[in-house]
Amino acid sequence: MPDTTNPIGFTDANELREKNRATVEKYMNTKGQDRLRRHELFVEDGCGGLWTTDTGSPIVIRGKDKLAEHAVWSLKCFPDWEWYNINIFGTDDPNHFWVECDGHGKILFPGYPEGYYENHFLHSFELEDGKIKRNREFMNVFQQLRALSIPVPQIKREGIPT
């Protein structure tokens, strides 16, 4: 009978999962000026960005240097941003996590009036040995339009049973 008390790789996978989860927790709980160092959680050629946009194409920031520049822009445009109601979900892959959360704060985009932005988000994190390889953010773009005082068209969905 084979020994199944410690399958090969089981302990290592759990340790890796916990290491990666700690990185995701740190990313999601980083606030204020500390956001200027969040790029340090990424691998050198890591990327992050917004996968739901008004254009239909993602905005992808590639590489630690560009992620650092993005942090400066983000702090200027979302000065008091915070994620809350954070729920982190592991997957069968110790290097992949999903996060469901809410976020809120001022939105200061040049050319638009100052607004207050609230939305519901999903994040996909792909990691490598405790560092983020790719972070994809998904949200309801209409909520951002509303926060910027941009009129949102209404879709008629006649007949939907609710």
Swiss-Prot record:
InterPro entries: NTF2-like_dom_sf (IPR032710), PhzA_PhzB (IPR004964)
Record keywords: Antibiotic biosynthesis
Induction info: Under control of LasR. In liquid cultures (aerobic), phz1 operon is induced by quinolone signal via 2-heptyl-3-hydroxy-4-quinolone (PQS). In biofilm (microaerobic), phz1 operon is not induced by PQS, because the biosynthesis of PQS by the monooxygenase PqsH requires molecular oxygen.
GO BP: any one term: phenazine biosynthetic process
Pathway assigned to this chain's UniProt record: Antibiotic biosynthesis; phenazine biosynthesis
Superkingdom assignment: Bacteria
Subunit structure: Homodimer.
Protein's job: Involved in the biosynthesis of the antibiotic phenazine, a nitrogen-containing heterocyclic molecule. PhzB1 (operon phzA1B1C1E1F1G1) has a role in the biosynthesis of the phenazine during planktonic growth.
Family statement drawn from the similarity comment of this UniProt entry: Belongs to the PhzA/PhzB family.
Protein name, entry field: Phenazine biosynthesis protein PhzB1
Organism from which the protein derives: Pseudomonas aeruginosa (strain ATCC 15692 / DSM 22644 / CIP 104116 / JCM 14847 / LMG 12228 / 1C / PRS 101 / PAO1)
Gene: phzB1
